[in-house]
């Protein structure tokens, strides 16, 4: 709990921290030992975690999660949905074999893990320079911002979840604020009207990042957080929607909503 407060960790960050911790401290121990220690630590932090075994006696860590996540097997048990994780594997790894629960007196205790990133974790530094270039109204623009590679690496461990979670999340906000400040400087320098300023930010969102579909670029469909969109070489319409939404809020204070059509996701601004 002290580390969670010190590093300003969200629930998911805390889960990854526990996974990393047990694999480091108990590196030479059996998978069963690591799994039991991870469950004990997660329960100590107030989360609803349980132990289970596969048919082949492989130990699994089960954690109850508040929101739905995808491409991940789960079991509904005692009015809670538990997603299956292996303590020594990437969090996105999926498991399909039948599992068997082991009951203990405190199985019903604890709270569900919240996947929304309500705050920006205090890890790493914004030290990866990224050049962003775009055109607007016949003129070329560019800015150099510094992204947090460690934060992006943490986000890369995030399982596929509903798009709304990415829209609600506040991770990566220092980078968004830096971009917002640079855009506002140009808006004031060019004395753009309100309508032209909105179009200017829209043009930035469309042209500052190289377009490609997730399937072509990465082999699977995956929403991204703002930091990932800016750091990764390619992004699609869904990935661009996340930083765009936060930019409109930061710069203009406008309400925004994503519109999810089959194969496309635009952003509506009020």
Where do the model's predicted regions map?
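Hydrophobic transmembrane alpha-helix bundles
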Residues: 87-98, 161-164, 248-260
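Intrinsically disordered, low-complexity N-terminal segments that are enriched in acidic
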Residues: 1-135
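Hydrophobic/aromatic-rich core segments of domains that either
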Residues: 49-77, 84, 186-192, 239-270
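The feature marks a conserved, polyanion-engaging helical scaffold used by nucleic-acid processing enzymes
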Residues: 98-208
């Amino acid at each position: 709990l002290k580390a969670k407060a010190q590093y300003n960790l969200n629930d998911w960050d805390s889960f990854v921290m526990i996974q990393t911790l047990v694999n480091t401290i108990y590196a030479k121990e059996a998978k069963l030992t690591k799994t039991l220690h991870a469950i004990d630590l997660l329960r100590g932090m107030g989360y609803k975690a349980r132990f289970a075994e596969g048919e082949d006696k492989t130990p699994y860590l089960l954690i109850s999660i508040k929101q739905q996540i995808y491409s991940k097997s789960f079991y509904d048990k005692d009015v809670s949905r538990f997603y299956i994780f292996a303590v020594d594997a990437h969090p996105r790894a999926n498991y399909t074999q039948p599992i068997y629960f082991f009951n203990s007196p405190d199985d019903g205790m604890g709270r569900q893990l919240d996947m929304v990133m309500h705050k920006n974790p205090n890890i790493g530094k914004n030290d990866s320079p990224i050049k962003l270039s775009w055109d607007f109204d016949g003129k070329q623009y560019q800015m150099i911002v510094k992204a947090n590679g460690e934060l992006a690496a943490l986000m890369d461990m995030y399982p596929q979840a509903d798009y709304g979670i990415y829209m609600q999340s506040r991770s990566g906000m220092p980078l968004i604020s830096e971009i917002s400040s640079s855009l506002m400087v140009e808006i004031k320098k060019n004395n753009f009207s309100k309508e032209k300023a909105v179009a200017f930010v829209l043009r930035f969102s469309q042209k500052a990042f190289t377009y490609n579909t997730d399937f072509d670029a990465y082999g699977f469909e995956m929403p991204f957080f703002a930091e990932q969109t800016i750091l990764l070489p390619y992004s699609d319409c869904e990935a661009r929607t996340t930083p765009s939404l936060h930019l409109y809020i930061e710069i203009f204070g406008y309400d925004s909503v994503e519109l999810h059509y089959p194969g496309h996701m635009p952003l509506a601004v009020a």
